[in-house]
């Protein structure tokens, strides 16, 4: 049900893309909120300055504005432990996020997707299949398109990719289909190294959902919110959707029905197959035929920065997996590689309080040579000092590798860490990797 904000004193906290989308949302209703950011010169400040009637504050927290407000819209990047939010909570001021605004505003059925890894890929696959079936759909949320940018569009379905940060401040979501693809340790710097808090945030996606899609290999993805919700499962060896193996072939299956041989897919790697199974589970609940779904899967090339083969020459393959910002994702990337040469693995960045020792089993592989850089380079180096090298920057790593690499090798950027110590995001890190290949190798 659409909420009336006319008598609310609204403060938007954060001037990123999400904050701007919230501002535009309220302006479209004739409401003029205040907006603030602790950065002195936020990236999108010019978009705010152009509105003459908007009060904005930068460089610090405006506590008097907080006291004057009775509704705060907070951007997902601002942690619950932020002093401003703690202050507002003590004053009993309502705090919500942009996704809460979105779900209160729309009556369009929502497909909600979360997970530590694979969210964007599954979101994109589901979108392509739904569109191929003749439905109108839009994606938004954590995928880089603020949800409020699509809220007024005509659609049969909205597909929301949701992070734990977004789910924290969402209370009214009633998804038609909800899924947690997987949960592995991530963002523990935000959750005080308590994975239970991370799991709790993810689990909110299931509340009041009609259909939940669960990963049977990852028990923490199982719906704890309601016993009566229809549940569909996927997994490697079991689940409604699963993989079936013979000596030479692997199939994506629905129960006893073989849907597609993985040899016919453009993507390889078990993590990609599992993502596809979850997407199949979602769209089949929309009564979309497997024939349509399989056609899309055959041609799906994946997304940039996700195990993306960016260059191959002289039998040397360069893979950009910059999106791997946690241990589980990096492990999946390594497992997907089949080579007779060396795997030259680039690790580095901010570990986000992760236990890097969890990488040790997969790094035992004698074919792996490790290159460490960035904020937590020393801890990464100490995992296997005898086969690791340490550098300050990604550029230094690439300069060294360009001299050492041999035919048959795979160079894999899969950092297992956040990029924010040296880059604006995983995209900039991945683009820098590609640019350095062009400069050093071409």
Swiss-Prot record:
Subcellular location(s): the record lists: Cytoplasm
Q: Which domain of life is it from?
A: Bacteria
Q: In which pathway does it act?
A: Cell wall biogenesis; peptidoglycan biosynthesis
Which EC numbers does the record give?
6.3.2.9
Reaction(s) the record says it catalyses: UDP-N-acetyl-alpha-D-muramoyl-L-alanine + D-glutamate + ATP = UDP-N-acetyl-alpha-D-muramoyl-L-alanyl-D-glutamate + ADP + phosphate + H(+)
In its keyword annotation, does this UniProt entry include Nucleotide-binding?
A: yes
Named from the GO MF annotations, one term is: ATP binding
Q: Which InterPro entries match?
A: Mur-like_cat_sf (IPR036565), Mur_ligase_C (IPR004101), Mur_ligase_C_dom_sf (IPR036615), Mur_ligase_cen (IPR013221), MurD (IPR005762)
List the GO biological process terms: cell division; cell wall organization; peptidoglycan biosynthetic process; regulation of cell shape
Q: Name one GO cellular component term.
A: cytoplasm
Task: Keyword check for Transferase, yes or no.
Answer: no
Q: Give the keywords, sorted.
A: ATP-binding, Cell cycle, Cell division, Cell shape, Cell wall biogenesis/degradation, Cytoplasm, Ligase, Nucleotide-binding, Peptidoglycan synthesis
| Stated family | Belongs to the MurCDEF family.
HAMAP family in alphabetical order: MurD
Q: What does this protein do?
A: Cell wall formation. Catalyzes the addition of glutamate to the nucleotide precursor UDP-N-acetylmuramoyl-L-alanine (UMA).
In Swiss-Prot or TrEMBL terms, this protein is called UDP-N-acetylmuramoylalanine--D-glutamate ligase
Q: What is the lineage of its organism?
A: Bacteria, Pseudomonadati, Pseudomonadota, Gammaproteobacteria, Enterobacterales
Which gene underlies this protein? murD
């Amino acid at each position: 049900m659409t909420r009336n904000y006319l008598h609310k004193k609204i403060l938007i906290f954060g001037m990123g893309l999400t904050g701007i989308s919230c501002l535009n949302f309220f302006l479209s209703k004739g409401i003029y909120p205040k907006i603030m950011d602790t950065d002195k010169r936020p990236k999108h400040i010019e978009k705010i300055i152009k509105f003459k009637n908007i009060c904005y504050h930068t460089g610090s927290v405006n506590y008097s504005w907080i006291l004057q407000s009775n509704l705060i819209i907070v951007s997902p990047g601002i942690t619950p432990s932020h002093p401003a939010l703690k202050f507002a909570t003590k004053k009993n001021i309502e705090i919500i996020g942009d996704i809460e605004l979105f779900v209160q505003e729309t009556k369009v059925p929502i497909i909600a997707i979360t997970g530590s890894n694979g969210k964007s890929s599954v979101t994109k696959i589901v979108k392509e299949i739904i569109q191929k079936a003749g439905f109108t759909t839009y994606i938004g949320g954590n995928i880089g398109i603020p949800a409020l940018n699509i809220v007024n569009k005509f659609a049969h379905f909205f597909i929301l990719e949701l992070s734990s940060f977004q789910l924290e401040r969402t209370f009214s979501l009633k998804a038609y289909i909800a899924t947690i693809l997987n949960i592995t340790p991530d963002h523990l710097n935000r959750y005080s190294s308590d994975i239970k808090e991370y799991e709790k945030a993810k689990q909110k996606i299931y509340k009041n959902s009609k259909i939940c899609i669960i990963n049977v290999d990852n028990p923490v993805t199982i719906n704890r919110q309601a016993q009566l919700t229809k549940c569909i499962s996927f997994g490697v060896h079991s689940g409604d959707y699963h993989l079936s193996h013979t000596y030479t072939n692997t199939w994506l299956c629905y129960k006893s029905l073989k849907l597609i041989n993985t040899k016919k897919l453009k993507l390889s790697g078990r993590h990609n197959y599992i993502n596809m199974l979850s997407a199949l589970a979602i769209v089949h609940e929309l009564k979309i035929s497997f024939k349509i779904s399989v056609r899309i899967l055959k041609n799906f090339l994946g997304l940039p920065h996700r195990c993306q083969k960016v260059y191959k020459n002289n039998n040397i393959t360069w893979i950009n997996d910059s999106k791997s910002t946690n241990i589980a994702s990096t492990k999946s990337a390594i497992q997907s590689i089949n080579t007779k040469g060396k795997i030259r693995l680039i690790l580095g960045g901010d570990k986000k309080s992760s236990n890097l020792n969890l990488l040790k089993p997969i790094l035992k592989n004698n074919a792996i040579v490790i290159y460490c850089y960035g904020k937590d380079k020393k801890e990464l180096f100490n995992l296997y000092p005898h086969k690791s090298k340490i550098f300050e920057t990604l550029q230094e790593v690439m300069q060294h590798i360009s001299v050492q690499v041999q035919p048959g090798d795979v160079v894999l950027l899969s950092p297992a860490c956040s990029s924010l110590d040296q880059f604006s995001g995983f995209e900039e890190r991945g683009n820098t990797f590609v640019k350095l290949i062009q400069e050093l190798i071409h």
